[in-house]
Amino acid sequence: MRGRDGVPRLCRVLGNPLAFTVVQILAENGDIRPSQIAQAVGRSVARVSNVLAALRLAEVVRYETEGRTVRYRLKHPRETRKLLAALDSFIESASAVRR
């Protein structure tokens, strides 16, 4: 995912509330198993795995296997944390304007 074509794709995948929550969890916890994410969000492992696959295609996450254990992490952790912080700041500013 490079250049301007990647931006709409990234926005589309992060527009899914579950995917956005998964990214937040990964930003807070580093590498983590899909079952741990599923438990944290109260969804099935299958549903979380589908979301992780979409995030992988959008080049947001990557995974590593160790035996039968799969762990996911952010592909670009520093940049992703900056993006999450910028989105939080935008929401705060927009909320202040509405008051």
Predicted regions and their residues:
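Amphipathic alpha-helical dimerization/coiled-coil segments
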Residues: 1-7, 28, 75-99
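Glycine-centered, phosphate/nucleic-acid-interacting loop/turn motifs that mediate DNA/RNA or nucleotide
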Residues: 59
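N-terminal helix-turn-helix DNA-binding core of bacterial DNA-binding proteins
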Residues: 5-44, 66-79
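Short, hydrophobic-biased segments on the C-terminal half of alpha helices
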Residues: 23, 52-53
